[in-house]
Structures are given as C-alpha cells and as structure tokens.
UniProtKB/Swiss-Prot annotation:
Designated name of the protein: Short-chain dehydrogenase/reductase ATR9
Family according to the record: Belongs to the short-chain dehydrogenases/reductases (SDR) family.
TM spans (from-to): none
CDD domains per record: SDR_c
Function: Short-chain dehydrogenase/reductase; part of the core atranone cluster (CAC) which products are predicted to catalyze most or all steps of mycotoxin atranone synthesis, starting from geranylgeranyl pyrophosphate (GGPP). The initial cyclization of GGPP to dolabellane is probably performed by the terpene cyclase ATR13. The Baeyer-Villiger oxidation near the end of the atranone synthesis, which converts atranones D and E to atranones F and G is predicted to be catalyzed by the monooxygenase ATR8.
Length: 253
C-alpha cells in the first residue's frame, strides 16, 4: 500500500469535524500536519486533543479567515508561514472549511451571495491558484476539496447549497487539468454528525438516531468515517479529477 509517512499536509478547516478527523488520522500515519482555521482558540484546542490521542504527532496550528474578499493575500501568507515552519514544500492540501449555513432560495439575495462567495465559491479557485507555488509539483501530491451530496442529488429547500457544491465539483475537475501533475479531487459527504449539528444533548441524539434510521445503513456518518476518503485520495497516486462519495448510500434512496 502506498505510504504518506513523512509527507507534509495542510488542512484548511482542520480544527473541528471532518478536518480534525483527517488531521488525527494523518498524524497517526506519520504525516507532518499543519492545521489552519479562522479561530485560534479552536485550533489550539484541536492540537491539544490530537496530541493527546497521537503522542508522536508532528502538528502545527495556524489561523486564517477566508470569509473576506482579500483571501488571495491571506492564502499566500498562510502557505508561506506553513512552509517556513515545516521546512519545505507541502505534499497535500485539504480544504474542509465551510459554514454550512446557506439560506434557502426564498431568502436568497445578492447580498447573501456576496457574504458566502469568498469561502464557498472563490476560495477553492484561489487555493488552486496559490497552493501549487508552495507544493511539490508531482503526481504524489494532491489537493482535496470538500463537496456535498446535494451537488449530485438536490433536495427541495437546498437549492443554494446545491449550486455551491455543484460549482465546486466542476472546479475540481477543471483544476485537475490546470494543475497536473498535482492531483485534484474532492470528497462528497452525506449527512455527517459534526459540531454544525449543535452542542451535544439528548434531543440531538434523538434527532440523529431518527435521521440515521431512514438511511440505508441505519446510521449517519461520523467525521472519522468520512476522513478515510481523504486519506485514500492522498495515497492513491492514480486518482485525479474525481469526486469520492461517502454518504451511506444516499444516492440509492
């Protein structure tokens, strides 16, 4: 099996949820991990948790806010800080950052688009523009974005987010052509129980159980389930321009 041990990875949005799970698994595989998020406190908390779970982990934390329109310069600053701190170019970039709070079509306005565009529409393209300058330009290297099941199977009430992930899927394939031999892929999760569901509570547990009971597997995905797909895409040096689904069979229902 191909190894990623000793390689260097930056996870943008790696302080919680799926990104934090990817960071944990990567540390366990002996990867040098850099985690970036908009909240310094969450980054520090995530690092402490991962270091407790994987004592031998090589992990650093950084802060970056990609919700503003000057995100290109913010990304350039982040990538420079990471390669300076780790002592060399990156092998992999993973982007899991997102808010998950897009409005419904009836509430959608041009202002709502302007507020969500930097993170959900512009950031992936800017990562594709900026990241290669700080990466090993080789087919072993990869960029992996985070898409969503609504891009392939929309649901009523989720038109806006379906449009965003549909655009990301198209960008993923186009960037695979533009950035070759660096591989570009995306993971498309279905419903996944992360912090975005809200704080732990009995009511949340019941809601998650009810939603899971309707799925093909009788459960919802967990960050650790979906994180496996990102690790796979880093390992598989023959995959590019691909959207990998991790949704519990949602497209079959």
């Amino acid at each position: 099996m191909p190894t990623i041990r000793g390689q260097s990875i930056l996870i943008i949005g790696g302080s919680s949820g799926i990104g934090a799970a990817v960071a944990k698994y990567a540390c366990g595989d002996g990867v040098k991990v850099s985690v970036a998020s908009s909240n310094k406190g969450r980054v520090e908390k995530a690092l402490k948790k991962i270091q407790a779970l994987v004592p031998a982990s090589e992990i650093l934390g950084f802060t970056v806010d990609l919700s503003q329109y000057d995100l290109e310069s913010r990304l350039e600053k982040l990538f420079k800080e990471v390669v300076d701190a780790t002592g060399g170019p990156l092998d992999h970039v993973v982007m899991t950052a997102g808010t998950g709070n897009m409005v419904s079509l009836s509430e959608y306005t041009a202002k709502a688009f302007q507020e969500s565009a930097p993170l959900h529409f512009i950031a992936p393209l800017m990562v594709g523009k900026v990241a290669p300058r700080f990466m090993n330009r080789h087919w072993k290297s990869s960029i992996t974005f985070t898409s969503g099941a609504f891009g392939k199977k929309p649901a009523k009430g989720y038109c806006v987010i379906a449009s965003a992930v549909g655009a990301l899927d198209a960008a993923t394939r186009a960037l695979a052509l533009e950035l070759a031999p660096i591989r570009v892929n995306a993971v498309s999760p279905g419903p996944t129980v992360t912090e975005m569901f809200g704080p732990p509570s009995e009511a949340l547990d019941k809601a998650v159980a009810a939603m899971g009971a309707q799925s093909l597997l009788g459960k919802l995905g967990r960050p650790e389930d979906v994180a496996e797909a990102y690790i796979y895409l880093m390992r598989d040096a023959n995959t590019t321009g691909t959207i990998v689904d991790s949704n519990g069979g949602a497209f079959l229902q």
